Amino acid sequence: VEWLNIDFEGRRKAYIFNDPAELETIIKRAYDAGYTSEMVIQDFIPGDDSRMRVLNAYVDQHHRVRMMFLGHPLLEDPSPVAAGNYAAILPDYNEGVFRRIKAFLEDIKYEGVANFDMKYDERDGEYKLFEINLRQGRSSYFVTLNGFNLAKYFVDDLVEDTPFDGNTLFGRGSKLWLEIPKSIFLDYVAEGADKETGKRMLKSGDWGTTLEYSKDMNPLRWLMIRHMFSIYKKSYAKY
């Protein structure tokens, strides 16, 4: 949060450094601009956006994982201030990933929504966790879109105190989530089997977006979304 309130030459949401001197320069500029918190330096995992995965889980008040759902991002926002924000997500399934993260969450006695970002490392065939967000992510509607309403899990647990049999639901889905116009998906997602899957979902109507909710639509909102989409188109063309 503190990072959002400072400004300096070269400021981005995230960086990839090949030169230690460049790293030192950015760190100095950040602290000179008023940043006071720690910084995280991680090994760069090779590969494009399609190597990413995002996992959402709901853990109840008794620290039991009730539901897990995995997404396969195909495209991210390319702009410097929003790098890493997902723009297109396919549903995915990986029981090995589910079970390892389930064990971790229950071992630390976690409670609430957990949102994990990870990337497949082709160097050793393992998924490397980048972070856990202690909240829903900005793209977490892809879980609800695929039939697993995150808000309902809160109500069932904290309001209704619905009994849980201990069998964690590992979700499977069939819908593509988009934050961007369909034209950007078609133009910028790398060619391959995953893109073909997404194209079939678009053609069959098995897709959705957080933005265009019909019951919340009015002329001003429609114009705002069109403006947002025009910014996305300029951003992808530029970066």
Report the location of each language-model feature:
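Conserved anion/nucleotide-ligand pocket segment
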Residues: 1-8, 12-16
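Phosphate-binding site of ATP-dependent enzymes
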Residues: 17-79, 92-99, 120, 126-128
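Flexible, glycine/charged-enriched surface loops at secondary-structure junctions
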Residues: 40, 111-115, 164-170
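Glycine-rich phosphate/pyrophosphate-binding beta-alpha loops
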Residues: 75-86, 133-147
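Oxyanion-binding "anion nests"
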Residues: 80-83, 91-116
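NAD(P)-dinucleotide binding in Rossmann-like oxidoreductases
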Residues: 94, 144-147, 151
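Conserved metal-phosphate-binding beta-hairpin within the catalytic cores
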Residues: 105-141
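Peripheral (often C-terminal) accessory segments that flank ATP-dependent C-N-forming ligase machineries
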Residues: 152, 156-239
